[in-house]
Amino acid sequence: MPALNNSEAGTAEAEPLTRLPFEPITKSHILNCSYDNWHAKYRSSTLKSRIIPLTSEFLSYLREDGIVLPSEIATFPPPETYNNNSTSDGWDEDTDTGPDPSEKFSEIHKQIQETIAELDGSVVPKLNWSAPKDATWISLKQNSMECNTPNDIYLLLKSSDFITHDLEHAFDGCAEDPSITKESTQYVLVLRKWFKVNPSCEFRCFVRDRRIIGICQRDLNYFEFLFPLIPTLREVIQEYFDKTLKDTFPDRNFSFDVYLPDPFDKVRLVDINPWAPRTDPLLFSWLELLTLSVPSPLLGVADSSSVPPLPAQSSDEDEGTDDVEELGWMPEFRLIKKDDPEAYSFSSPQYSAHKMPQEVVEAGASGEGGMREFADNWQRMLNGELEMMGAGEDSDDDDDDDKTTR
């Protein structure tokens, strides 16, 4: 076979990428990253949590349009009257409560109540892969995922696009595998004990070929005090990875999130994420992470990157050592710098695209009457009377001039 001349070879190498060079993403990899599939193995370093397997009835409730909450004593007082000139309190006291949706999943409802009590009354919910971070706008806990009752949890889960993705699109973009389907997946509700998190202490780590190749902040704001701590943080995270995750997680490529509270000497494993475009690379790009040149290990399986090999070690002490690593190479540790554009552009609220349902936008655009009608319907929805969607015609407001067609 004739060899390519230099010009032909150069042309071949210069072909631009038309897509990110991911290996085929398998459904088994997605399942390996499901919380219930790794939590037991790494429980000693995770945050205190409980896992509740979900039934088809509960999943149907999450998938239903609209928001109907079970009857339950509210954990917050009703807001002040929306109309200061009104002689009534603005809330419907003569209600005809509809069927309680929790009757279809009474065992799950009871387990949630018991778990909240076990975890000191405050929890943070998530499903197999995602937490409803995009739905905190609807929470009455000031943009927090803290939940004190089952209804707090249901409201977040049913309002979240991230949760919908877990339920409907978990295996999008994966290679075909008839043995793994959405219907055969065991969905779970994870309830973590709530505590006040310092967002500056959360980090995302990217693993390729069982090696950390990059670490960065999860919260994209500038924290000056972190820069002198980079060597310590990198060492503590690397040591945790080498002892806990490196040889035990079933996939060689993945990312994981950790929390290192002050004094930054102990790692808490928060999550394990797929090595896939759906995972946010944050301060990196996926093209960087996929093509970054990394030295091949002296022993064991070589890294897939095409880089010159390191010279062989001549010391007799190196022979037979299984944990030999390259000297002088460390994973890159990225933080937001004071003058970075990200230090300012990311100071805006996260997940803003998910924060305002169309009904609220339309009610606000309709003026005072529209917002009054929406407030009535919202309170009735919290009382379990009606669905949030399509509730306008049931408003008890007698002033026809104030009604708005939507």
Curated annotation (Swiss-Prot):
Binding site for ATP: 126, 129, 131, 133, 192-195, 202, 204, 218, 257, 271, 273
Predominant place of localization: cytoplasm
Record family assignment: Belongs to the CDC123 family.
One term of GO molecular function: ATP binding
GO cellular component: cytoplasm
Positions with biased composition (Acidic residues): 393-406
Sequence positions that bind Mg(2+): 271, 273
Protein name, entry field: Translation initiation factor eIF2 assembly protein
Function: ATP-dependent protein-folding chaperone for the eIF2 complex. Binds to the gamma subunit of the eIF2 complex which allows the subunit to assemble with the alpha and beta subunits.
Organism in which the protein naturally occurs: Botryotinia fuckeliana (strain B05.10) (Noble rot fungus)
Pfam families: D123 (PF07065)
Keyword Chaperone: yes
GO BP terms in the entry: eukaryotic translation initiation factor 2 complex assembly
InterPro entries for this protein: CDC123
Signal peptide limits: none
Residue ranges, annotated region (Disordered): 78-102, 303-323, 387-406
Cell compartments where the protein resides: Cytoplasm
